[in-house]
A protein has these predicted regions:
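Conserved catalytic/acceptor-binding region of the Class I
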Residues: 100-166, 173-187
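Short conserved AdoMet
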Residues: 11, 84, 98
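C-terminal lobe and adjacent flexible extensions of AdoMet/dcAdoMet transferase-like proteins
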Residues: 165-243
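A short SAM/SAH-binding and catalytic strip from SAM-dependent methyltransferases
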Residues: 72-87, 107
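Class I SAM-dependent methyltransferase SAM/SAH-binding core
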Residues: 1-67, 73, 87-88
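Short alpha-helical
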Residues: 1, 23, 81, 110-111, ...
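A short glycine-rich, Lys/Arg-flanked "PGG" loop and its adjoining helix->strand segment in the class I
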Residues: 87-102
Length: 243
């Protein structure tokens, strides 16, 4: 859906959609094709009005298969929280951006799924919910990666679910798997699952189970380079004209 909206917002631009998970990428491509007319599908890569249709690439954010200085906008929606090396991803975003290009993204902050973490704490001593990065640390990463004028913001959104199964099923559908170092190595048994469901039901309000999502918003620009590729500082000298 977002890919189609970006293509509609920038009709003369070439949109490249990247995802490390091939099934998610295939779903995005199918949704994009459903949103296009028969004529647009027949035109294939030329899209409508001469604009290129979106390209779909299976790739990792920390190793983009794109040449340097080739895009004007990097748009990332709820992806960075699944990346193990976020500074490296930011460095890759900056590498492919043109000078004056914009990075804009959303990700999850530390208070995300705090209710689920509390419920799991009653079940065992393992870590089940990811440790999401604070927005101030993300801002520092942007600066260290060479971005200019970073702006960060956040909001807390609480979604409620009718049952533990509904909550856990939705988390699975968005790819929220447990990749923390403290995760249990064995499968979740029936007893542990029942204990988790009971702990979640104990947190219910008005018969619904809350799940908090701390959504972090950020954007930053790629400014003029301050150093050469050899690491030497770039000093600009302007000639003054005598009046």
């Amino acid at each position: 859906e977002a890919i189609g909206e970006l293509a509609a917002r920038y009709p003369s631009a070439r949109v490249v959609a990247l995802d490390a998970a091939l099934p998610m990428l295939q779903q995005a491509r199918a949704r994009s094709m459903r949103g296009r007319s028969l004529l647009a599908r027949l035109l294939g890569p030329f899209g409508r009005g001469g604009a290129s249709a979106p390209a779909f690439v299976c790739a990792d954010a920390t190793s983009l298969p794109l040449p340097g200085v080739c895009v004007e906008l990097v748009w990332s929606n709820l992806m960075l929280q699944w990346v193990n090396d976020q500074p490296r991803a930011f460095a890759e975003f900056r590498r492919v951006l043109k000078v004056g290009g914009l990075l804009t993204f959303t990700t999850f902050g530390p208070d995300t799924l705090k209710e689920l973490a509390r419920a799991f704490a009653r079940v065992d001593g393992h870590t089940h919910v990811g440790r999401f990065v604070d927005m101030h640390d993300l801002g520092d990463m942007l600066v260290q990666s060479g971005f200019a004028d970073p702006v960060m913001d956040m909001e807390l959104i609480t979604v409620t679910y009718p049952s533990p199964d509904a909550l856990l099923a939705e988390l699975k559908s968005i790819g929220a798997t447990n990749q923390t170092r403290g995760r249990p190595r064995g499968l979740t048994g029936r007893g542990r699952r029942a204990a988790l469901e009971a702990a979640l039901l104990a947190l219910a309000r008005d018969g619904r189970i809350p799940a908090t999502f701390e959504v972090v918003y950020g954007h930053a620009w790629k400014g003029e380079p301050k150093r050469t590729q050899d690491g030497l500082p770039i000093v600009k000298v302007e000639r003054r004209h005598r009046g």
